[in-house]
Each structure stands twice: as C-alpha cells, then as structure tokens.
C-alpha cells in the first residue's frame, strides 16, 4: 500500500475516534483544514516532524500513523508485485 494512503487512512480513523472535525483538528494542531483533507485523501506527503506534531495533537504515538491495519495488509496482499527491471 502507498504510505501516503496508509497515513491518511490511519489519521482519519484516529481523528474521528478522538471526536475531531477536520476544522477543529486544524485549529489545535496548527495545520490548515485543506492540509488535513489532503492528508486523509493520500495527497500529502508529511515530513517526520509533521507526523510527530499530528500524533501529538491526537495523543497517540507517531507509529500509529504508519502502522498498517488489517485492511491495508489485505490490500497489499492483493496488489501485484512489481518486478524490478535490470538494465
């Protein structure tokens, strides 16, 4: 699975579990609502520092944002493996 999508999926799940709207999370974390939306859609590639700040605002360890869940593991297993091309 693409890491941006994985982080976005985990972030959205954790944000909702903590009861934050995108707007409220943006206010408490210092990012914009547009950034939050892009992150959840897998369109943003957050830095390690940004992941740390997001995790802190959620009250979770940063590893929670990058750990595959069961759905991600199943999706990865279904994806065809890319063969490396040797030149």
Predicted features and spans:
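A short, Lys/Arg-rich alpha-helix, primarily the initiator
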Residues: 1-17
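Residue-level signal for the short linker/turn that defines the boundary of a DNA-recognition helix
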Residues: 9, 19-20, 46-49
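Residues within the helices of the helix-turn-helix
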Residues: 12, 23, 52
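Alpha-helical residues within the helix-turn-helix
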Residues: 16, 27, 56
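The DNA-contacting recognition helix of HTH DNA-binding domains
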Residues: 22, 33, 43-44, 62
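DNA major-groove recognition helix of helix-turn-helix/homeodomain DNA-binding modules
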Residues: 49-64
């Amino acid at each position: 699975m693409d890491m941006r999508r994985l982080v976005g999926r985990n972030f959205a799940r954790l944000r909702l579990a903590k009861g934050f709207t995108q707007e409220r999370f943006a206010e408490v974390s210092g990012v914009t609502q547009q950034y939050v939306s892009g992150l959840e859609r897998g369109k943003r590639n957050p830095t390690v520092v940004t992941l740390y700040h997001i995790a802190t605002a959620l009250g979770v360890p940063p590893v929670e944002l990058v750990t595959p869940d069961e759905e991600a593991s199943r999706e990865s297993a279904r994806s065809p493996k890319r063969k490396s091309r040797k030149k």
